[in-house]
Amino acid sequence: MSRKESRKDKHRDETETIADWLKEHRVGEVECVVPDMAGIPRGKILPTTKFLSGLRQGTLRLPESIFGQMVTGVDAETEMLTYQAPDLIMAPVASTIRIVPWYKDPTAQVICDCVNFDGTPSEVAPREILKRVLKLYEERGWKPVVAPELEFYLAAKNLDPDYPLQPPAGKTGRPQTGRQAYGIDAVNEFDPLFEDVYDFCEAQDIGIDSLIHEEGVAQVEMNFNHGDPLAIADQTFLFKRTVRQAALRHDIYATFMAKPYEAEPGSAMHIHQSVVDAVTGENLFATRSGKDTKLFLAHIAGLQKHLPAAMPLIAPFVNSYRRLVRFLSAPINTHWGHENRTVGLRVPISDAKNRRIENRVPGADANPYLAIAASLACGYLGMVQELAPTKAMEGNAYESSRYQLPRHILDATAKFRASSDLKELFGEKFVALYSDVKSSEHDAYQQVISPWERQHLLLNV
């Protein structure tokens, strides 16, 4: 059987699986969602009959230009996409179809891959970029495992973007006025909201476990169960939308912006990652006696060497770099260490089976597909290049001036654009297009006059 025939058979099987599911759940509308470069859900909402007709005839389409959009929704300046570029076909992934739990009428959502008319995957779709990295691991007989920890803030509704955010009022009717790290009652202030979050996640098979109050005012963290990176990225993508929708039901905002409050810590998406043997499931990061392996150390070394160039994928906006400052629970370099929360790469104490690395650099604002792809790609490069890490940091990494991360999106984008290793892994078209999007976003940001400038420059200079 040819590859083309195999793709047709798979498409036919997935189509009938989806059709049966929609009939069983009596779905009236379907949301076809595609994560763009920023992780924003884009796509189409269709009546079920129209959706199935389009699925069978291959007429569910989106312009490739959605991947050239900035977070503002405006097209970036780029030569990677032309005005005559054909549409991409949306290919719904049957395993991701779910009922949207916050709608009154039965409505489904399904994550879609984007493929060319010849059936080949898009070169620039973020979900395909992650699949590309996972294929490299598969070819080596390795299987990565990840578990994100995702932080976010709750905020009172704010209709004026020039006005600073304020913490929301909870059950007591009073906003939080101080930090309550790990505070049980502080979390319970928003019990009705989190009950909705858990219910919505359960309805969508989003595997979250613990909930804690983080260091910031009205800042919380929810952790995901560990699992397959693509499935976890799908869940994280849906989770961010779910939390925002749950918060709106309670008349407040939930934000995954990296640094929404000036005087508070930023929000991260720490990624715990390990690699197991694809056949035996044995953790390749530790021997059975618990000793670190060469592959484990090489994975760390790859993160140390290549993360600075991959920064636009894990710290994608100007605001992202406001989070990466000293003494506010965020890293500023790629030092690594055991149980050291001042480093970028922390190794938690564990037995051999659970040996892993916690990448503390990614922000909550990152596209989960691209953040996980970047983190795994850097570790992969270390493994295949047989790199050796620095000595583990035993002191305060904030006091070190070595192995610094880029301090600004322009610097990070320049490193990303110039990295031959990342171009080979992700593809030249993706690296160029993503870099153009980041550069255009910065140009748009530079057009805005900030309140700080008006306050301090208007009458003083």
Residue ranges of predicted features:
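Short glycine/proline-enriched loop/turn "hinge" motifs that connect secondary-structure elements
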Residues: 99-106, 144, 211-215, 264, ...
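Active-site neighborhood of thiol-dependent amide/isopeptide-bond enzymes
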Residues: 226-238, 261-262
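Accessory "access/gating" subregions that flank catalytic or transport cores
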Residues: 181, 186-190, 194-208, 222-229, ...
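Core alpha/beta catalytic barrel or barrel-like domain that forms the active/cofactor pocket
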Residues: 145-153, 169-184, 204-223, 254-270, ...
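Catalytic-core signal marking the mid-to-C-terminal active-site face
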Residues: 2-5, 18, 238, 245-246, ...
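Short beta-strand elements
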Residues: 163-172, 269-277, 334-336, 343-349
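ATP/Mg2+-dependent ligation/transfer catalytic cores
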Residues: 1-208, 232, 401-461
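Short, hydrophobic beta-strand segments
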Residues: 110-116, 220-226, 273, 359
